[in-house]
């Protein structure tokens, strides 16, 4: 009984936060029209898309995505995120989805040697049910999201979340990443098979569209956990 009450309360809180954040996003971003929130996926028969500097990325459409500071999920971790935009691309090849992200970051934060040091990072997010009605703010107790999280220390995490503070690592050997440090910042590719087991995340096989969200962390700016730059609304992968 207590568990059910807690779940309902979390859902209500999540909906309230979503309403507030969506309104703020619309005002701050000038409400990017839904028709413009499209990431077009380039489908190729083969080839190597795993590297951020692979030739295929010169052919894939590039979309500029605006980011905003995420709603503070924890009152002790607050601030203004540094990253304001990133360039997103996507390729479907050899039964995998490859997502390439590129953004400006003046300093490379790749290690944490002390408690006041934090890593650069980036992530993409999908609603497991494939529905835009899912909250883009880490989901809710009923609607789970799947996050692919790249960290600048070389780790790549496959996560499931049911709301703020609920991110849970889910073992998988199929999520991969590659990164390149450029003179301007980072270029990162995250990839995973289109089809995975239900308990491992979002199934992308056979879909014509899929909601997707983005996030970036600037370690130099003390960003970690919920302090990050994010998309406040779902964008759409269009296969």
From Swiss-Prot:
Subcellular location(s) per record: Periplasm
Binding site for heme b: 74, 138
Main location group: periplasm
Gene3D superfamilies given in the database record: 2.60.40.1190
Co-factor binding details: Binds 1 heme b (iron(II)-protoporphyrin IX) group per subunit.
Gene Ontology molecular function, alphabetical: heme binding; metal ion binding
InterPro entries: Cyt-c552/DMSO_Rdtase_haem-bd (IPR019020), DMSO_Rdtase_II_haem_b-bd_su (IPR017838)
Keywords: Electron transport, Heme, Iron, Metal-binding, Periplasm, Signal, Transport
SMART domains referenced in this protein's UniProt entry, alphabetically: EB_dh
Cofactors: heme b
Signal peptide: 1-27
Applied uses, from the record: Has potential use in bioremediation of waste sites contaminated with chlorate, such as pulp and paper industry wastewater.
Gene Ontology CC annotation, any one: periplasmic space
Free-text function comment from the UniProt entry: May transfer electrons to the iron-sulfur centers of ClrB.
Subunit structure: Heterotrimer of alpha, beta and gamma subunits.
Name of the protein: Chlorate reductase subunit gamma
Organism per entry: Ideonella dechloratans
Lineage of source species: Bacteria, Pseudomonadati, Pseudomonadota, Betaproteobacteria, Burkholderiales
């Amino acid at each position: 009984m207590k568990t059910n009450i807690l779940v309902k309360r979390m859902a209500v809180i999540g909906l309230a936060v979503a309403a507030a954040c969506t309104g703020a996003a619309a005002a701050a971003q000038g409400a990017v029209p839904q028709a413009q929130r499209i990431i077009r996926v380039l489908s190729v028969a083969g080839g190597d898309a795993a590297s951020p500097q692979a030739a295929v990325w010169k052919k894939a459409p590039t979309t500029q995505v605006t980011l905003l500071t995420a709603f503070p999920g924890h009152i002790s971790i607050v601030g203004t995120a540094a990253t304001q935009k990133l360039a997103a691309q996507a390729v479907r090849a050899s039964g995998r989805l490859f997502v390439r992200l590129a953004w400006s970051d003046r300093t490379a934060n790749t290690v944490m040697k002390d408690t006041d040091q934090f890593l650069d990072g980036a992530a993409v997010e999908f609603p497991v049910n494939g529905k835009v009605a899912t909250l883009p703010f880490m989901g809710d107790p009923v609607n789970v999201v799947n996050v692919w999280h790249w960290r600048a220390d070389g780790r790549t995490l496959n996560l499931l979340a049911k709301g703020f503070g609920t991110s849970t690592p889910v073992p998988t050997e199929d999520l991969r990443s590659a990164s390149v440090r450029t003179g301007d910042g980072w270029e990162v590719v995250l990839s995973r098979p289109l089809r995975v087991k239900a308990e491992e995340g979002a199934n992308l096989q056979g879909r014509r569209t899929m909601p997707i969200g983005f996030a970036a962390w600037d370690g130099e700016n003390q960003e970690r956990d919920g302090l990050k730059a994010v998309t406040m609304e779902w964008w759409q992968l269009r296969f």
